[in-house]
Every structure is written in structure tokens, then in C-alpha cells.
Amino acid sequence: MHKRRRLLAFATVGAVICTAGFTPSVSQAASSGDGEEKGSYAETHGLTADDVESINALNERALTLGQPGKPPKELPPSASAPSRAPSDDRETPPAEPLDRMPEAYRAYGGRATTVVNNYIRKWQQVYSHRDGKKQQMTEEQREKLSYGCVGVTWVNSGPYPTNRLAFASFDENKYKNDLKNTSPRPDETRAEFEGRIAKGSFDEGKGFKRARDVASVMNKALENAHDEGTYINNLKTELTNNNDALLREDSRSNFYSALRNTPSFKERDGGNYDPSKMKAVIYSKHFWSGQDQRGSSDKRKYGDPEAFRPDQGTGLVDMSKDRSIPRSPAKPGEGWVNFDYGWFGAQTEADADKTTWTHGDHYHAPNSDLGPMHVHESKFRKWSAGYADFDRGAYVITFIPKSWNTAPAKVEQGWP
């Protein structure tokens, strides 16, 4: 038996729980004017301080495994190395028979939820196809999936998500006007006020739309392009026709190099260096802006208004300084999760609110207090609502082979 560990002192008492009812986008929710704040990830999911510590440690372990060349994150000045080994209770879900059908999901308030084992069954029936043939999820894939939210995107995209081609939308005029024409709330510090106004100036709906528009342009450029040079020329033609500011990106930028840096593009059973065999797809990352460990402690607690803003012309977000560092606690006992990932793929549903985003709650630990991993399929408003742990939402483009079915044109939420 495991004893329940110390409880978190939650940052927001009586907060809106993001898993229930209607919730606006993460940016709009932060400045809705109704006096209510978003709940933390831990509060929403009933997690303890030890749970959050373990989740963040496992997220860092996944980053090390998935991106071995990426420098490790810096610890906050007030922090020390973990007193125990990063969570040793994660388990890889067992294999599921290829012919075993999923059970019904639990649906409520724009979200359908199931245990990870049942998601594997659905994945095998719906998303596993390679060249039209169903595949059993391999042990390596189940290992990736077991890491939780990032695991869902990881297993569907192929490599660990690099977040290099990220888009967002920030309303500079709204930000300046709100700073000038509104005042801090009672007992709100200037740093809290500026962080809240910055968060409220991001629009996830517009950021998602920008990523979809760019992915559409990329997919047009991929058609009938059998070498990278033809793809780049096609891409520049499409951008010229659309008068898109991305045309002025440097030829060495992430925008133009994204395809060649995709591992599956080079694999013989993937793209095999043929752009026409690839397609652009989308996932999302929610994270915290105040990651500069040499900067203001207030920004680490309440957000850095200047950090991770998109280019006003292209919508591109420079993610090079994203080290997946969580929000710093402002009070003893607070704990914040370092990020959340959601998988979109290549759905063709025009109405963003009807799209489905697949993500996990935490790593798979069925024999610990944390418990088994659950997989959520959320409508866009539910996904974009986010948590108080995060003040940025980026929409990222990557590539997968067309022969994979992990990003179908239509996604049915749950299982009938």
C-alpha cells in the first residue's frame, strides 16, 4: 500500500475546473473579467506535490531520451537536484491483441476519456495503419506513450516533438491598451498584473488558424515534389501567391529546413527523401513563459510579458529558449507542471471548435498512488482552455509520411 503524499497548497481557491462546462481559450480565460482564475493542473487532476515533482522529472527524462543532443535545463536558483531518482514507478502498458476492440470512452463537457490500455486498442483499430494495414503498437511505441501527454504526440508523430516550427497570435495593441487603461486587481502586484495582461493578449484560436493555414500551404507545395529543391520552389511560389511574410524567411530558417530535419523523411519506409510522400501535421504545446533562470524571480512566478511572443508578420515563435522549465511557486507548497502536449494531426474539419485534440493526464503508473494514465480527446475549446500552470500556447507543424494513418482527415471523439 502507498500512503498519500503531502497535498499541494493550490494557487487558486474555488477555481474554475477546466474539465467541466464551457471554457474560453487560455488567453481569453485569463482576462475574462469575471474575477475567476483558471485552476492548476494538479488541482484539476487531484495530484499531490510529490505527483507534480514526479511528472516533471519524467517529462525531463523523456526529453533526454527523445532529444539526446539538447542541453539539460537549468535548475532555478532556489532549487536543488531532486532528492530521489526521477520517478521509478512508470510502467510500459502491456501489449493489446490487434483484434481486440475498444470499450466506450467516458464523455463529459467536450471531453472523452479512457485508460491508456483502451486507447491502445483504439489506436490499433484506427490510427495504426501503415500502407493501409493495421499494426500492433510495438513495445517501443508503448514505451513512448507511457510518458503521458508528450507520449501521445510522440507516438503519433514518430520522433520526440522538437517544437521548432511553432506559431502563435499576440495582439500588441490589446496588450498596450490594457496596460494603459486597466488597473491591477486588489492585492495584485505589478508583476502579476503585467503577466496576466500579456497572457490575455494571446489568442489560441488565431494561433491555431495560422498554423493550419501554413500547413495547408506546405501540403500544396509537397504535391508532385519528388525532391527537396522542387518542394522549396513550390513553397516559395505558394507564399508569393498568398503574399505571405514567411517568404522572407532566411533559407536556413526552421521554416525551410523543417522537412529535411524530419527523421521519417529520410527513412526508406517513410518519405525516402521524396517530399510528395510526406504531409504537414499539427500538434500543440502549452508551457510557461518565465523560464529565464537569470532574470527576475517575479517573472518566473507570474510570467514574462516579453517571452515567446510570435513575430508579428509571420506568426513564428522562437522556441529556442524553451527549456520546459515549470512556473516557480509564489507560495510554499505550490507546484506547477512544466508542459502539456495535444495531438491534432491533419483533421479537415473547418470549424476549430469541432476539432479533437488527443492528450494524456500523466505518465502511466498503475501500481502507485498516481495511478494509470488516462487519454483525453478534447474539443478545441476544452484543449485551449489550459491551466494556470501555463501562459503560452504554441501550435506546431511537423511532418509524417502519408502512408501513416496517425493523422487522418477525420477524428471521431471517443468510441461508440
Swiss-Prot record:
It catalyses: L-glutaminyl-[protein] + L-lysyl-[protein] = [protein]-L-lysyl-N(6)-5-L-glutamyl-[protein] + NH4(+). Residues 30-85 form a propeptide. It comes from the Bacteria. Residues 1-29 form the signal peptide. Predicted to be exported by the Tat system. The position of the signal peptide cleavage has not been experimentally proven. It is an enzyme of class 2 (transferase). Keywords: Acyltransferase, Signal, Transferase, Zymogen. Residues 64-103, 290-331 are annotated as: Disordered. Its EC number is 2.3.2.13. Residues 86-103, 295-309 have a biased composition (Basic and acidic residues). Residues 76-85 have a biased composition (Low complexity). GO terms for molecular function: protein-glutamine gamma-glutamyltransferase activity. Catalyzes the cross-linking of proteins and the conjugation of polyamines to proteins. This is Protein-glutamine gamma-glutamyltransferase.
